[in-house]
Amino acid sequence: FLEGGSSASQRSEAPVEPTTETVPEQSEQSEPPEQPEPEQEPEQPAAPERSLHQQNMLDLLETLAVKGRAPKTGYSRDEFGQRWKDIDRNGCDQRNDILARDLTNVEAPKGCKVLSGDLQDPYTGQHIHFVRGQKTSQAVQIDHVVALADAWQKGAQQLSPERREQFANDPMNLLAVDGPANMQKGAGDAATWLPANKGFRCTYVSIQVRVKAEYQLWVTQAEKEAIQRELGRC
């Protein structure tokens, strides 16, 4: 022990002031940055609505068998019976009936035989003045829209002679048209020949579909695709 002193344990220590740390005030939480909106894909244009005619013809086309072209063996015009037979029994042959139906300003003084008239040709879009005569009659010809030879190679061989004759004279399959255009067409189907007049092509292939359905004739794959393309443009 030291005199006049106290032990270290007896010394009182100065109280220690508690320290407080200043906590910085939290600033208001900032809003999260706006996320960029995902880019929207451009809307695809809606497919054009099909007309009732288009849909009906496309549906009818689907009922036709698709096969290859059969050999032309045995074909002749005579296999389709009497030419221009008066099948509706109105007293006029079928050629004159179609001329009277398709021409305007028709002159037929004796009732049946069309002597002249005007044709707005569906195949070329041109106007043709028809005058009957040895050198002029062929300017306007009557076309089988489904050609006889084409029909022969796509099912008509199996038809009865009477049914083939009906086919060859059916007004649904006959059109008054420009002679040279008809000669150019020959026995072509929709895959190999279409009218130069694009405005008539929809009607043209529609007639072919109806006729082939009526007489249970088939189409080739290329022919079917050509018809589908034209119906899609109707």
Where are these regions (language model features)?
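Acidic, glycine-anchored loop motifs typical of Ca2+
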Residues: 89-91
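Exposed alpha-helical structural elements
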Residues: 53-60, 94-98, 203, 207, ...
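Domain-level detector of nuclease and nuclease-like folds
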Residues: 123, 127-234
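N-terminal low-complexity, Pro/Thr-rich disordered segments
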Residues: 2-64, 234
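N-terminal post-signal-peptidase region of extra-cytosolic proteins
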Residues: 80-85, 94-116, 159-163
